[in-house]
Regions:
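Secreted/periplasmic proteins that engage bacterial cell-wall peptidoglycan
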Residues: 46-71, 77-82
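Non-catalytic cell-wall polysaccharide-engagement segments
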Residues: 2-36, 42-44, 62, 79-162
């Protein structure tokens, strides 16, 4: 009986240690992506914390996330944005770095059109030609998607001492 209990304890310890290593590896990858975001955003009007908040909302930092035609960390629509990806030489939208680069490029393009971060997020989420979204925004309505991301981005800025 003692031998069985000892084996069970050993298995549980090994499982917990393995789980801890997986969690540590996930944090390491997320740290790498966060550094990459910071680097790209140095030459951009886009706040890195905004990008991080978009990633949290879109994929929960899961680089393998797929929702229809939208893939990766920033859930880039691979049909709509294939030309942009090609122009940026980002050939694999499932690659986290390519996905981040294309996602930030989309945000930059939207920021050129709409200076308000809420509008940028609304159209990132719904698409450039969302007529209902345009009308709603013109009437002062901000989507819950945009509100949640803006709140999280502000929280991340506070955490980063900005």
């Amino acid at each position: 009986m003692r031998r069985v209990a000892g084996t069970i304890v050993l298995i549980l310890l090994m499982w917990c240690f393995g789980l801890a290593l997986i969690v540590q590896a996930e944090h390491s990858r997320q740290d790498d992506w966060t550094e990459y975001i910071e680097l790209i955003c140095l030459d951009s009007k886009i706040c890195p914390e905004l990008v991080e908040a978009v990633i949290e909302r879109e994929s929960g930092w899961d680089p393998t996330a797929v929702n229809g035609d939208c893939v990766g960390l920033m859930q880039v629509d691979q049909i709509i944005h294939w030309r942009r990806a090609q122009e940026l030489n980002c050939l694999d939208l499932m690659d986290p770095y390519d996905n981040i680069r294309v996602g930030i490029s989309i945000l930059e393009d939207l920021a050129e059109r709409y200076e308000d971060p809420a509008a940028v997020l609304m159209f990132y989420n719904a698409g450039y030609s969302d007529k209902l979204g345009i009308r709603a925004y013109e009437n002062g309505v901000i989507s819950s998607y945009a509100s949640v991301i803006l709140e999280r981005a502000a929280e991340l800025e506070r955490l980063h001492g900005k």
